[in-house]
């Protein structure tokens, strides 16, 4: 599974570790990413999403249906990649 939020489209970033002597080595800044199940009322099923904490706050603010429609419109996910559970 890739490290991309399905609601916000955020990805893991690449940067540098900087030591005291200012030597730089590559590192990744990972997301606060987790898998979460939601009950999708419109289709009467459970869906599983991979999202970050900001994506969860967006779902709490807008609602699941509006957040999914916005994510599909912006191209962060499509209806084929949303996993239907059980």
From Swiss-Prot:
Top-level lineage group: Bacteria
Keywords, comma-separated and alphabetical: Ribonucleoprotein, Ribosomal protein
Annotated family: Belongs to the bacterial ribosomal protein bL28 family.
Gene3D superfamilies: Ribosomal protein L28/L24 (2.30.170.40)
GO biological process, one term: translation
HAMAP family referenced in this protein's UniProt entry, alphabetically: Ribosomal_bL28
Protein's name according to its UniProt entry: Large ribosomal subunit protein bL28
Coiled-coil stretches: none
NCBIfam families: L28
């Amino acid at each position: 599974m890739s490290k991309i939020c399905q609601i916000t489209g955020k990805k893991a970033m690449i940067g540098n570790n900087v030591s005291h002597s200012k030597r730089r080595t590559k590192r990744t800044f990972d997301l606060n990413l987790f898998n979460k199940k939601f009950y999708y009322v419109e289709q009467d099923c459970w869906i599983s999403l991979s999202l970050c904490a900001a994506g969860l706050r967006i779902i709490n603010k807008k609602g699941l249906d509006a957040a999914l429609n916005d994510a599909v419109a912006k191209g962060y996910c499509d209806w084929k990649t949303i996993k239907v559970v059980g």
